Amino acid sequence: MNALLDEASSKLYLNSDVTAELRLEGSPHELIVNVFNGHHTALDTSLVEFLINSLDGSTSETISVYTTERVTGNMQVVDWNLYKSKWTQLQLIDFPEPGPRPIADLPIGADRSALLFSLRDVRGKLGEPVARQTPLGWTCLGSPEMDPGVLQTNFTFLVNNLST
């Protein structure tokens, strides 16, 4: 499973196919999703709980997540080990290897800030990627492309919790 550290996200979600693969079971739940023009739509989901660990075992936390179909769409995971040789500040960073699935399955957001905060940042020149060590391990901010003109867009969906 690949996690996406997303400070703009306010709830934890996990792709439902991963939930099924891991045989995680939870309680049914209904979420109200804010969509365009002030409209809302109901989303049937489950609330599941599991233990998340850093790869080195130094951090461990039980988290509750809502299941959904492709929460990040088809957002591909960047294997920074393939790109780090382009920038001197990244060359000695031991980035984690992505999981076997090429997409991000679990956005971890502001509701779990203890997993997101920066223990150490390694920066280069203005516009270059920044390596960030978090309690879960190393990640990188920025584009893996040398051209800073390459545009990247990420979408965040806002969800309200509706108690059932």
Model-derived regions, located:
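RNase H-like polynucleotidyl transferase catalytic core
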Residues: 29-39
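Hydrophobic "anchor" residues on beta-strands that sit immediately upstream
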Residues: 2
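Classical protein tyrosine phosphatase
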Residues: 7-31, 125
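Intrinsically disordered, low-complexity regulatory segments at domain boundaries
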Residues: 7, 39-45, 49-164
